[in-house]
Amino acid sequence: MGLLAFLKTQFVLHLLVGFVFVVSGLVINFVQLCTLALWPVSKQLYRRLNCRLAYSLWSQLVMLLEWWSCTECTLFTDQATVERFGKEHAVIILNHNFEIDFLCGWTMCERFGVLGSSKVLAKKELLYVPLIGWTWYFLEIVFCKRKWEEDRDTVVEGLRRLSDYPEYMWFLLYCEGTRFTETKHRVSMEVAAAKGLPVLKYHLLPRTKGFTTAVKCLRGTVAAVYDVTLNFRGNKNPSLLGILYGKKYEADMCVRRFPLEDIPLDEKEAAQWLHKLYQEKDALQEIYNQKGMFPGEQFKPARRPWTLLNFLSWATILLSPLFSFVLGVFASGSPLLILTFLGFVGAASFGVRRLIGVTEIEKGSSYGNQEFKKKE
């Protein structure tokens, strides 16, 4: 193990990275709160500013993937599709099998200039997660309780509000509704069999309401649906903790573009289209498991320096006063002050670990274990 690889495994460095992310996030959230005064004056200016503020926070996580762990991402698609990236509004459909699938999506958003304006249909619980949920609130992210009777009006209103968004946005949908686990897959396939739908090997049964509603509400705004099927070489199952420890992964993403006009207007037909899409995604995963790669041309978009420069800027601003403060605490010789500081460090470490826990599969929601048995 080289010196750099050794340093990446050290708890103290993890604490410093976490400190920069949390404190910069709180600063960004405060500035976002102040920008609310702009909404009545210029809604579009408010949106543009918040896209850049969100970028300053999200890009720190992307930096960990691209520069800290040096994880590589390869696209399997065609040249015509690549040329449209970042130049149109799009709905993204991504499989939800991995703890860092969102991070791989974000790194592609960053490389094509839409990270700050990226959107997602997110579960309501995430709204209350510090930094993440707060930042999303100011970005007009659409939240749902995953109970369609209660969500319908909220989701429709949130989607329609995005129809005049001033920056190109990629709107992410996890159509499976929850992250893949063996238990959820078994329950999901029982439902598929009961409904006469083809059994999926690598995905859960897609929940169609969110997709058909998004397509309906964003028609005229969104130009296409990008179907993204993600997997990792070497049968790896990466985690955010692994990224933090500097582990390098190799992500492969098969991207297919479907013009929105090719998706049926009728809700039932659109739902059937989505089910067919997931059968195709399942077939793509089977090909990957057999051949170790997806079909199509390979593209490796170059990582950009902005994520690293953004993090280094925040680190320079925040760590200098932190080091001065720590030196002052220990120089004081006060046992009470030192113990108080160490207690704060422990609490901060616990808080950062809880944030990471949001991404972990074993700590994910139980949604899907029984929900598939209910009528969608």
From Swiss-Prot:
Cellular component terms per the entry's GO annotation: endomembrane system; endoplasmic reticulum; endoplasmic reticulum membrane; Golgi membrane; membrane; nuclear envelope; plasma membrane
Function summary: Converts 1-acyl-sn-glycerol-3-phosphate (lysophosphatidic acid or LPA) into 1,2-diacyl-sn-glycerol-3-phosphate (phosphatidic acid or PA) by incorporating an acyl moiety at the sn-2 position of the glycerol backbone. Acts on LPA containing saturated or unsaturated fatty acids C16:0-C20:4 at the sn-1 position using C18:1, C20:4 or C18:2-CoA as the acyl donor. Also acts on lysophosphatidylcholine, lysophosphatidylinositol and lysophosphatidylserine using C18:1 or C20:4-CoA. Has a preference for arachidonoyl-CoA as a donor.
Protein name in the entry: 1-acyl-sn-glycerol-3-phosphate acyltransferase gamma
Protein family according to the UniProt entry: Belongs to the 1-acyl-sn-glycerol-3-phosphate acyltransferase family.
EC number: 2.3.1.51
Lineage: Eukaryota, Metazoa, Chordata, Craniata, Vertebrata
Entry coiled-coil feature ranges: none
Keyword Cell inner membrane: no
Keywords in alphabetical order: Acyltransferase, Endoplasmic reticulum, Lipid biosynthesis, Lipid metabolism, Membrane, Nucleus, Phospholipid biosynthesis, Phospholipid metabolism, Transferase, Transmembrane, Transmembrane helix
GO molecular function: 1-acylglycerol-3-phosphate O-acyltransferase activity
Membrane topology: Multi-pass membrane protein
Domain of life according to the entry: Eukaryota
Catalyzed reactions per annotation: a 1-acyl-sn-glycero-3-phosphate + an acyl-CoA = a 1,2-diacyl-sn-glycero-3-phosphate + CoA; pentadecanoyl-CoA + 1-(9Z-octadecenoyl)-sn-glycero-3-phosphate = 1-(9Z)-octadecenoyl-2-pentadecanoyl-sn-glycero-3-phosphate + CoA; heptadecanoyl-CoA + 1-(9Z-octadecenoyl)-sn-glycero-3-phosphate = 1-(9Z)-octadecenoyl-2-heptadecanoyl-sn-glycero-3-phosphate + CoA; 1-(9Z-octadecenoyl)-sn-glycero-3-phosphate + octadecanoyl-CoA = 1-(9Z-octadecenoyl)-2-octadecanoyl-sn-glycero-3-phosphate + CoA
InterPro entries: Acyltransf_C, Plipid/glycerol_acylTrfase
SMART domains reported for this sequence: PlsC (SM00563)
Comment text on domains: The HXXXXD motif is essential for acyltransferase activity and may constitute the binding site for the phosphate moiety of the glycerol-3-phosphate.
Membrane-side (Cytoplasmic) residue stretches: 1-124, 340-376
Primary location group: endoplasmic reticulum
Any one biological process term the GO annotation gives: phospholipid biosynthetic process
Distribution of this protein across tissues and organs: Widely expressed with highest levels in testis, pancreas and kidney, followed by spleen, lung, adipose tissue and liver.
